[in-house]
């Protein structure tokens, strides 16, 4: 099973007052927290690849371990990202259209690997091998989602998929019955995801197929919190 983890790091941060992805949460920029945990999981699971989608060139360069990066970026984590990038399992996708809504980021993440040009040197790869069997969407403004939860969710959904190969499962991390991110989609739903427009996200597709949805419950509600305002970050 080939699993593509699409890391959505392209939002406009309208309510935050500045680019929240670069806002420091603890000792790191917000976007790096979950990306580094996801990279650690991918290092252990060779079936995973990570596609980072952003409209911000600096973020994409840092994501793959290039450029000076933030001074707080631990060398071991930066090196891990660089090694994954060097092996073709972590790659950046420049998506200026993402400013028009999340559907553009979703589309860019799914189509990554197509031989399209990019204004950033070295940021376009021709994906080797077959297309992904699964797309899992992560959001970069969810800095408290743990590495353990990421790995457990992916293992849970691999088991679900393996038990019934005729089904087309969708998976969602939830807390107290409330769905959150990340969300797992069988490639069966690829065309529906590509058909999204504007600021409509993958939850729209999920809600159309609730009979196929498997929820993975976490105990800590904080893991699923995202940060939309400075008050969110300060209060959490």
Question: Model-found features: residue ranges?
Answer:
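Short beta->alpha connector loops at strand-helix junctions that form conserved
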Residues: 91-98, 216-217
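Acidic donor-binding segment of Leloir-type glycosyltransferases
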Residues: 42-91
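Residues at the starts of beta-strands that form the adenosine-phosphate
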Residues: 47-50, 134, 212
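Short aromatic/basic micro-patch
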Residues: 24, 144, 183-184, 215, ...
